[in-house]
C-alpha cells in the first residue's frame, strides 16, 4: 500500500519547508497551489515534481478535491502547510497504511498559539480526520470549514502521535 501526503497552499513559504521535511517518508507528495506570489512553489518543487497551480479559487473543499484527483497512491494524508507530522504520528500512519484496512483515521492535533502549545480548554486533542483510502472518502464542497465525507460508512479509528499545528504566532495573526 502506498501513501500520498497532500497539501493545498497559497503563500506558505514561511511554513512549507518545515512541513515537507516531516513528510519525506511519504511515497508521493502532492502540492496544489492557489496562486502564490512568494516562493511557495519553488520550495514545494524541492520535495516533489507534483506541484500544480490552480488559482480558480472555489473554496477549501473544492481545492482539496482537486488535489485528491492528482493522487496516484492508495492512501491520502491531507496536511496543511502550518502542520508538522511527529515521528510518533508517522509510525502510527505507516502502521495503519500497512494494515490496509479501509478506514478513516483521525489524528490528534496539538496547536501552538502565541508561543506555546495549548493542551487545555478543548484545544487538545483536536482530532482531525486526515488519513483515508483514496476513492473511499473525500472532501465536501464547502467554501471554508470543509469536512471529510464518509459515504461508505467506513469505520473511524484514532491514531497516536501528534500533528503539530503552528497556528497563531501573535495577536496580529489571530
Name each model feature, range by range.
Residues 61-68, 75, 86-174:
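Catalytic-site signature of metal-activated, phosphate-bearing donor transferases
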Residues 41-70:
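Conserved donor nucleotide-binding strand/loop of the catalytic core
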Residues 14-17, 38-47, 88-89:
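Acidic helix N-cap motif at the loop->helix transition within catalytic regions
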